[in-house]
């Protein structure tokens, strides 16, 4: 009798690939200033909170014809940080949403703003728009939860959003399914303030506020 085990062909398990390094994996949701207090109350009771930061300041967006864009960010508060950052973002070819994008960040503290903007212009970038954000940032090991307002330059009306972002430093250790597990975990926690899968925004802030530049 031939051992059935010898006739068994084991199918090789196809391992799901990890997310690429420098990937920004996040979801956003519309909110309202009336949700801020409850958001903070909920998040501050979640175990393993690493730290909280409040920051505000302008984000200047610049675009290129190929669809990529740059963002120059300056943190005005806390005032002693003198935080400045230049970011390049790329939307993957064929992507249907902005949940996962390539993002490269450089700290540029101490570099004059005009030097950054002139350098961006020399690389083919064109100014598109400027917004000011006020952010309540809660950092956990696996994700960062943020409630923030957005105000366009020259406009008094503010928009409000909640954001769940997978930790950038370790996102490449996860598969996409594992990243979604983290997103869904925090969506369930934040459901009382209107955060759920049905309310995920398909557009990024860039797509919501960008101007048609000719």
Describe each region flagged by the PLM.
Residues 126-173:
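Conserved, surface-exposed functional patches that form binding/active-site neighborhoods
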Residues 47-52, 113-117, 165-168, 175-185:
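Domain-wide signal for the mature, well-folded portions of proteins, strongly enriched
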Residues 169-207:
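Mixed-charge, glycine-accented linear interaction segment located at domain edges/termini
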Residues 2-143, 195-214:
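N-terminal strand-loop-strand beta-hairpin
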């Amino acid at each position: 009798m031939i051992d059935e085990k010898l006739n068994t062909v084991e199918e090789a398990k196809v391992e799901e690939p990890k997310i690429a390094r420098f990937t920004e994996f996040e979801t956003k949701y519309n909110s309202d200033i009336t949700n801020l207090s409850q958001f903070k109350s909920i998040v501050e009771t979640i175990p393993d909170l690493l730290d909280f930061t409040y920051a505000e300041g302008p984000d200047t967006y610049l675009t290129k014809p190929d669809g990529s864009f740059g963002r120059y960010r300056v943190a005005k508060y806390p005032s002693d940080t003198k935080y400045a950052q230049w970011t390049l973002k790329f939307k993957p070819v064929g992507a249907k949403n902005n949940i996962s994008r390539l993002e490269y960040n450089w700290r540029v503290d101490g570099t004059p703003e005009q030097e950054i903007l002139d350098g961006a212009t020399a690389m083919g970038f064109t100014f598109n728009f400027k917004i000011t954000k006020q952010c309540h940032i809660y950092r956990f090991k696996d994700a960062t939860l943020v409630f923030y307002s957005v105000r366009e330059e020259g406009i008094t009306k503010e928009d409000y959003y909640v954001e769940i972002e997978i930790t950038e430093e370790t996102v490449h250790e996860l598969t996409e399914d594992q990243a979604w597990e983290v997103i869904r975990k925090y969506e369930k926690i934040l459901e009382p303030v209107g955060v759920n899968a049905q309310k995920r925004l398909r557009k990024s802030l860039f797509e919501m506020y960008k101007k048609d530049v000719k």
